[in-house]
A protein has these predicted regions:
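A conserved beta-turn-beta hairpin within the catalytic core of GNAT-like acetyltransferases
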Residues: 69-78, 87, 106-107
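Conserved beta-strand in the GNAT
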Residues: 55, 61-69, 76-81
Length: 107
């Protein structure tokens, strides 16, 4: 990772799904469930939990992701991941903060 490149943390959209799925498969030992993690499954998840899932993006490329949802009382983080070459730069921390802020706003 270049130190001069900025990482944008923003809400995940379905347009990100392909890159997010590729990131999941890139990470050794990352568990993917065929039903929940399918395009249709993630689309349902994002509709139930708008604004709480985030991506980290560098130059249009997804380098991190958190799927985050809630049931009205309890928030839960799923699939917290950062691409191996981008770790130890605070990206995960920034994504967690963004998702927590969305949960606190009652998203």
């Amino acid at each position: 990772m270049s130190g001069t490149m900025e990482i944008l943390i923003r809400e995940m959209t379905m347009e990100d799904y392909g890159q997010v799925y590729d990131l999941w498969t890139e990470i050794k030992g990352f568990g993917i469930r065929s039903l929940d993690d399918s395009k249709e499954g993630v689309e349902r998840f994002l509709k139930r939990n708008p604004a709480t899932s985030v991506v980290a993006v560098q130059n249009g490329h997804v380098v991190g992701n958190i799927l985050c949802g809630h049931d009205g009382r309890t928030g839960c983080f799923y699939h917290v991941c950062v691409a191996p070459g981008y770790r130890k730069h605070g990206i995960g921390y920034r994504m967690v903060r963004a998702a927590m802020e969305a949960l606190q706003k009652g998203a």
